[in-house]
């Protein structure tokens, strides 16, 4: 349920897959959920993989741009494996430590901010954590900012890039990594 994924990132990933599949590059798709849990779920992912059918905002956006067939189906097949992020029911106490662990990567200079600002941010994060129904393991472990996102791992299993939004730079990075070997 990510219009930007289906209009840009997935077609870009398909191009990368087609271009580099014979050079040992592997492309994997990962569906995640940080909202709209009624639509971002395993059943709808299976339906997408098996039939090409999309739902929710993706269906609305692609339909608006005339990019669907038979009303709700993609005009292309996704040729690489797709999995679902591990979603766990949010539970546990929201501690000051958890709140700060969330804040510091986003606002490194947090401690030097005025007290009123810090208190506002802490309250917003606390409210956000209280409202979270599920946690998406990969999404959170890689501190992804949203979708679409790309994670690039080299042949040795070393994380080389995590990016949000446009993925145009990935092709050049893959070329560079292939030349390293």
Set out the residue ranges of the language-model regions.
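Structural microenvironment flanking redox-active thiols in thiol-disulfide oxidoreductases
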Residues: 7-103, 108-110, 134-135
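Thiol-/selenol-based redox modules, centered on thioredoxin-like
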Residues: 102-181
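Short pre-active-site segment immediately N-terminal to redox-active cysteine/selenocysteine motifs
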Residues: 1-2, 9, 34, 146
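The substrate-binding groove and active-site-proximal loops of carbohydrate-active enzymes
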Residues: 1-4, 161
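Short, surface-exposed alpha-helical recognition segments that flank or form part
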Residues: 4-5, 126
């Amino acid at each position: 349920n990510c219009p930007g994924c289906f209009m840009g990132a997935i077609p870009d990933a398909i191009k990368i897959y087609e271009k580099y599949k014979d050079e040992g590059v592997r492309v994997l798709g990962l569906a995640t959920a940080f909202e709209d849990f009624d639509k971002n779920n395993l059943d709808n992912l299976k339906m997408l993989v098996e039939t090409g059918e999309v739902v929710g905002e993706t269906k609305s956006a692609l339909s608006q741009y005339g990019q669907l067939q038979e009303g709700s189906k993609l005009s292309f097949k996704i040729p690489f494996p797709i999995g679902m992020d591990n979603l766990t029911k949010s539970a546990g106490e929201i501690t000051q430590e958890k709140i700060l662990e969330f804040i510091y990567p986003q606002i490194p200079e947090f401690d030097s901010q005025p007290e009123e600002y810090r208190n506002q941010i802490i309250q917003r994060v606390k409210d956000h954590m209280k409202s979270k129904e599920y946690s998406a393991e990969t999404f959170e472990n890689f501190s992804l900012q949203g979708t679409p996102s790309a994670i690039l791992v080299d042949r040795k299993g070393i994380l080389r890039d995590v990016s949000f939004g446009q993925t145009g730079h990935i092709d050049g990075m893959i070329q560079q990594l292939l030349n390293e070997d």
